[in-house]
């Protein structure tokens, strides 16, 4: 796929999963880290470098063997990277040393974001002294968060100062570190998103994720985030704008807070694959790890490559941490996961230690409710008396993926559009039905239309009244055939809807049926599906034969008893 060698600073689980993605694409990777680190365990290259990614000589040794260098952790020696880049002028380093330097010092990162007008929680620099923190408490109020500027992750660099009495504990907890203080953010949800930045500066977003933390460590990720579309859109724009402000390319994890007043502030950025993006391995078209490789090697990034696999894809990621009391207890969770349809287990080749990340489990289903149900079983929250019924549910046949999307601008259109649904049910066509307003939810409409192909939708039936822009706008954004249903409104008897849908410009066709006749839309959709599935052709032939038989029976009856008795019998 690419003849260049990628050198990775760091051989932990993130490096391991980058290597897994690289192996599928025949991309050679070399690792700088300790012997037998997780990433080195799965590649038999003889020229890995044993050493530290914070040591200049070791970085030089790796640089001499690779064409492109990247990181799986930002805690590297940036000055060494800059010197190595001068020493090896053909070597490409992504993210750039400049970007890593801006991000690895979290206070510098915050100042950079403020400069680029990205909303963040207010923060100030502090000295490592009780007097300085007393002043900070007066300035920011209690509680506030004391944070290490560098070498901090998984909550290990944070200390919540609830009152003046906590100051000395905080200084002891974060001793000998450069510090800053952050105002307490009263948030109701933590959100995260993976953003890809290409070599030419374009950015691509993965779905917004809701993260649940336990003891300051990511415990669960829910995808898509359980927040309104408007919140997801705001979070996506904020994250994209933040990443646009940094030079270079690669994947970035962006963490955000959804505050009590529904505003969003950016918490922090990681210039690498991120724990909250592990779900992408099973739930998305391209995983975060492959996307990172595509970015740093300037490989193709096709349309919708960061999308969920289907419109009905839901996922939960569960982190596996070493149990503080029972060694290898997490393996019991893995055992239950192996018995669970839609669950995938990823172990990192690390010795189990208390609260150490040793793996994760991805659960992918067609609904969040089903994901939650399976999560409960995997975590052992379901008791034995109902275990059998739970397993029956888990092993139930998956709902077939929809082939037809039935959409409408308002629930007031549902009585009309339900006829199309009934027709699809009659022909045993799997379909989905939802509300997508061209005027009130334009971003949702755009997402629905642009992702239709990747989700396996073959035909879209769109009903709309009045201005009736929905069918035409959807047809403009997807190669999937669109059938328009003019819905009769309170004025103009639906003629306005008919004209809006049928009068499409050349190049953007909409197959338009009669006013309020979604029955025909359903039948037409089945005929379209019959082009690729002969089962639907046979069912359509049976349907037509049945119609003919009904008409012939009526004709025979009319001819036999005469029109007057026929009318009386109806």
Curated annotation (Swiss-Prot):
Pathway as given in its UniProt record: Purine metabolism; IMP biosynthesis via de novo pathway; 5-amino-1-(5-phospho-D-ribosyl)imidazole-4-carboxylate from 5-amino-1-(5-phospho-D-ribosyl)imidazole (carboxylase route): step 1/1
Domain of life: Eukaryota
GO BP: 'de novo' IMP biosynthetic process; purine nucleobase metabolic process
EC number, as in UniProt: 4.1.1.21
GO molecular function: ATP binding; metal ion binding; phosphoribosylaminoimidazole carboxylase activity
PROSITE patterns in the cross-refs: ATP_GRASP
Reaction it catalyzes: 5-amino-1-(5-phospho-D-ribosyl)imidazole-4-carboxylate + H(+) = 5-amino-1-(5-phospho-beta-D-ribosyl)imidazole + CO2
Keywords: ATP-binding, Decarboxylase, Lyase, Nucleotide-binding, Purine biosynthesis
Positions contributing to ATP binding: 137-192
Name of the protein in its database record: Phosphoribosylaminoimidazole carboxylase
